[in-house]
Regions:
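Periplasm-facing N-terminal accessory domains of Gram-negative outer-membrane beta-barrel systems
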Residues: 18-128, 132
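Periplasmic N-terminal accessory/gating domains of Gram-negative outer-membrane beta-barrel systems
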Residues: 82-105, 109-238, 257, 264-270, ...
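Solvent-exposed loop/turn elements at secondary-structure boundaries
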Residues: 160, 530-561, 565-741, 855, ...
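Transmembrane beta-barrel wall of Gram-negative outer-membrane proteins
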Residues: 244, 273-346, 364-390, 562
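Signature of Gram-negative outer-membrane beta-barrel scaffolds
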Residues: 311-313, 421, 447-573, 623-624, ...
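Gram-negative outer-membrane beta-barrel transporters
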Residues: 524, 670, 678-839
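C-terminal beta-signal and adjacent terminal beta-strands/loops
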Residues: 588, 674, 687-688, 692, ...
């Protein structure tokens, strides 16, 4: 059944779902001194910022306030004949739960009892691993002011690149956590998924000051979350019953920067990675339109980031962001929200680096980006809440090569150096989301109290991509000498992805034990839409023009994901919790998945190239054996049937979603008020991953390791080093296609111990510290590979999860804030980790593989992953601020931040290709110490 048809049925029959947490909750019971429950107590929840809520306690004395916006609240309990009870300073945070036991005393006269709330540092219902990022953490801890830097502060998360004072804020940073790659991350904003399904990444960049809080989950996700990857939920600011606002200006430049170049770097003539100038400015403002009925919020921010890469080339980024929100409480027990975000990114010099000169960099421009969301929430009773969320986003950008489209692009296989120019790329990614969320509470049912969160989510996203190589040619050199060339045909592919999700969570409280039972079902598809492609400029005979009709590849994912979690109060006072979780997670299917079988994908064929006239340009008569006899490699088309509208590739009709299985067991203890320590043991296994072996569609034959012959051996000598390598080839010429299927026998094991210490801001100080030790290995089994090349050295070794980064076995982090007298505040963030892997390789020419269409060269690992590493990494950032408070007129804050305080020149990357003349040369170092000056005004 098609997802769209099933969607309509689901909304009619079920109409419930539970989205990513964007609120906090208060639960409790009202009793007399002897413990007898008090029904009918009028309980009012109020704050200076939001409209009040009220309810009456049940026959069992229970009460619940759910979906409470973050902030400071007051709880008032009234019943004739009893003293009025007032609890102030209830500090509600995203995803946190207050469990209150309120005792009312009999009163002869009308009296009030007022107490100050103590927020629990240990959440008695949390089964997973999550971090609530408060305003203090966002604004007071020194950072480059983007979400990816906040991720760096979270326990167990490793980032690909170090962001020193904002030098990397113009680009999405890679990250990995607990064995899950960045492609499994779930991006959410105000309770609805915003993940870009074409890139499986964030859909845009953000104004950092638009965030009220963040909630980041790295393990033990409930059934509202599809994958086991990092789940981020951004809670954005909204207006309240008093006018509030803030403005900021931050500045740093080369005059505020040190020099950390080593003699090695100076000897190479490198300038070092540096900031030229960064400015960050903007405002946020909101308040009431009608008190207790309607509120607004507006914001605008700019980050102008001008960097110098290690070779002295410029890399400049301009981020602009406008955000607006309207909140309405027009009817009793009903809330509405309309929000809009208009982000934009312009970047000149993308990809600049030691192997990418300016002419090969790209200039990026946005293509009409915006995001809009409408939410309506209604509380039908104290036991039932429903919320409908509708969202639409339109993302897009284009990349134009600085070298232009009239020059042929080149790449040196040995040195890694790019030359000439680069390809043109553009993408548009419109998408829709619908969530219908529900929350239902049932007392004294099946031996306990049950809180159900349940429902349905639907997402549809299109992915329109166009890729064009200049003159439809790509040149390849071998250490400066002409080697091979690739003739290309533009890629113009439109795919569409859909996901329909059902999920149910039951939180069941029985005394000290809380059980969380959950199930989730995801139904996912990807289809190909109509498109047209032009013939190759240089090779129209084998790469002609095509008109592609829309078609369905015929596969659908039905992924069932059960979850079971528990917490147990070991001491009975809510201060020592044993937690556990057992879960299976599916993987999110990219909207692009069907492009594997689209004839509209970028297609190419490779040949040996002899530059006969020495002009450095490829012409067809210089391609040896063109078009068929000399074919070395190809992709995206059938060379022997070039006009067919059917791709030689296939997608297995039995293709399933990859799985991550998880087991967590942990202990958390409140040591003293506002301070806790925790330890968590984590086991994970990733399996049923994707696999793309060679495939002959005519015979339905999938090529396996039995079709490969070898090994062929070579002894390579480079700069006095000798390497004995081996590789395999086919016993016959390769087929035209590849099949997308599941990899049999292959799995990845992840084991970790994570220790954290958390001190919430009180008594003038705050701290978050963590230590993680982890091991992740890859296992191919008997049938988990086709080409045996490199398998012997990779099997059972450390996993090269993202190529090299994210591969540290251990890491430690600490953020700290202390409020000094006279309005001064000092804070810092320190981190240390094992150096990333140094995956050394050699590249060799392989005529045996070239003869069967597997390519003219191959890269061979020379050491098991993890045997060689980059140096230990450590860093320290410090901030000093001074607050000036003006009674009735807000607060002015002066800021001095220092990043990489120790001015370390730690190497971030070296050339790993042992056969290259630049082997082991520095390609990236840590940016030097830089001071950032800032001024902020709050009211």
């Amino acid at each position: 059944m098609r997802i769209t048809a099933l969607l309509a049925l689901v909304f009619l029959v079920i109409g419930f779902s539970f989205g990513q947490e964007q609120y906090g909750n208060i639960r409790g019971v009202v009793v007399e001194k002897d413990g007898a429950p008090l029904p009918g107590v009028t309980i009012t929840l109020s704050s200076e910022k939001f409209s009040p809520r009220a309810m009456a306690s049940t026959a069992s004395g229970n009460f619940r306030f759910i979906n409470i916006p973050p902030g400071i609240w007051q709880l008032k309990c009234e019943l004739p004949g009893f003293k009025t009870y007032i609890q102030r300073n209830l500090d509600i945070r995203v995803g946190n739960n207050f469990d209150l036991r309120i005792v009312l005393d009999i009163a002869a006269l009308e009296e009030e009892v007022t107490v100050k709330a103590v927020s629990p540092i240990v959440d008695t219902k949390k089964v997973g691993i999550s971090t609530n990022v408060t305003q203090e953490m966002l604004q007071e801890i020194p950072s480059a002011r983007d979400p990816w830097v906040i991720l760096q502060q979270i326990p167990g998360i490793q980032m690909a690149y170090e962001n020193v004072g904002g030098n990397f804020s113009g680009q999405q940073n890679g990250f990995i956590s607990k064995g899950s790659p960045i492609s499994e991350a779930m991006w959410n904003m105000d309770g609805i998924s915003i993940t870009d399904l074409a890139a499986l990444a964030s859909p845009f960049y953000y104004d950092f000051d638009s965030f009220e809080e963040m909630d980041i989950v790295t393990g033990g996700q409930d059934a509202s979350i599809q994958t086991g990857g990092v789940s981020l939920n951004f809670i954005t600011r909204r207006g309240g019953n008093r006018f509030q606002g803030m403005a900021r200006f931050f500045f740093s430049n080369h005059d505020l920067q040190s020099d950390n170049r080593t003699p090695e770097l100076i000897g190479l003539g490198y300038s070092g990675n540096r900031i030229n100038q960064i400015t960050d400015y903007g405002f946020q403002f909101g308040g009431p339109i009608v008190k207790d009925k309607a509120w607004f919020w507006l914001g605008y921010g700019v980050q102008d980031i001008r960097n110098i890469v290690i070779t002295g080339f410029p890399d400049n980024t301009l981020l602009k962001n406008f955000n607006a929100k309207l909140n309405l409480n027009l009817f009793r027990n009903n809330r509405m929200e309309l929000s809009l975000i208009n982000p934009g990114k312009t970047k000149n010099g993308r990809f600049a680096g030691p192997t990418v000169p300016p002419e090969c960099t790209e200039n990026q421009n946005p293509l009409s980006n915006f995001y809009i969301k409408l939410e309506d929430e209604h509380v039908f009773s104290s036991n039932l809440l429903l919320s409908l969320k509708l969202a639409y986003h339109k993302n897009g950008f284009e990349l134009k090569p600085q070298g232009g489209m009239d020059v042929q692009a080149g790449y040196d296989v040995v040195t890694g150096m790019n030359s000439g120019t680069n390809q043109f790329f553009s993408t548009k990614r419109p998408g829709y989301s619908v969530n219908l969320d529900g929350n239902y509470f049932r007392e004294n049912f099946l031996g306990g109290n049950h809180e159900l969160k349940f429902g349905v989510e639907y997402r549809l996203e299109k992915n329109l991509e166009y890729t064009k190589c200049p003159q439809d040619v790509w040149k390849y050199y071998w250490n400066g000498e002409p080697f091979a060339a690739e003739v290309d045909r533009e890629g113009n592919s439109e795919t569409q992805g859909q996901r329909l999700s059902f999920y149910l969570n039951d939180s069941n409280v029985k005394g000290r034990l809380t059980l969380n039972l959950a199930v989730r079902l995801d139904i996912e598809k990807s289809v190909v839409n109509e498109s047209r492609i032009q013939a190759s400029e240089i090779a129209p005979e084998i790469l002609p023009a095509l008109t592609i009709n829309a078609f369905d590849p015929g596969f659908t994912f039905y992924t069932f994901s059960p979850r079971l979690g528990f917490t147990f109060d070991l001491t009975g006072d809510g201060k020592t919790m044993l937690r556990g979780n057992l879960a299976r997670y599916g993987s999110q299917l990219g909207s692009y998945a069907a492009s594997h079988v689209s004839p509209g994908q970028l297609s190419y064929a490779g040949y040996y190239w002899s530059d006969a006239n020495g002009d450095g340009r490829v012409s067809k008569n210089e391609l040896l054996g063109y078009p068929y006899e000399g074919l070395l490699w190809f992709s995206g088309f059938d060379p022997w049937n070039p006009t067919t509208l059917e791709s030689p590739n296939a997608i297995d009709k039995n293709l399933k979603s990859p799985f991550t299985d998880e087991f967590l067991l942990g202990l958390e203890r409140e040591v003293f008020t506002d301070f806790s320590i925790a330890a968590m043991f984590i086991l994970r296994r990733n399996h049923r991953t994707y696999f793309y072996p060679l495939y002959d569609k005519a015979t339905n034959k999938v090529f396996t390791q039995a079709d490969y012959i070898g090994p062929y051996s070579q002894t390579i000598t480079s700069d006095g080093r000798t390497y004995n390598i081996e590789y395999w080839t086919l016993d016959t010429y390769r087929p035209a296609g590849k099949i997308m299927t599941n990899r049999p026998d292959y799995y990845e094991n992840y084991t970790s111990l994570e220790i954290t210490a958390t001190k919430r801001l009180s008594r003038r100080w705050m701290m978050n510290a963590s230590f993680s030790y982890q091991i992740q290995t890859a296992h191919f089994g008997k049938n988990g590979f086709d080409d045996p090349t490199n398998i012997k050295i990779l099997d059972g070794a450390r996993l090269l999860a993202e190529g090299w980064w994210g591969s540290s076995d251990w890491m430690a982090k600490m953020s700290f804030l202390y409020q000094l007298p006279w309005g001064f505040n000092v804070s810092w963030f320190a981190n240390v980790r094992q150096g990333f892997m140094f995956p050394e390789q050699v590249v060799v020419q392989t005529p045996e593989r070239a003869d069967v269409g597997l390519g003219a060269d191959v890269y061979i690992y020379t050491a098991r992953p993890g045997e060689k590493r980059l140096p230990l990494h450590y860093g320290l950032d410090i901030s000093l601020t001074k607050d000036f408070r003006f009674k009735g007129y807000g607060m002015l804050t002066l800021v001095v931040d220092a990043f990489n305080v120790l001015n370390l020149g730690i190497v971030q990357w070296r050339d790993t290709l042992a056969t290259s003349p630049t082997y082991n040369q520095v390609q990236e170092i840590l940016n030097p110490r830089v001071v950032r000056l800032g001024i902020k005004y709050h009211f």
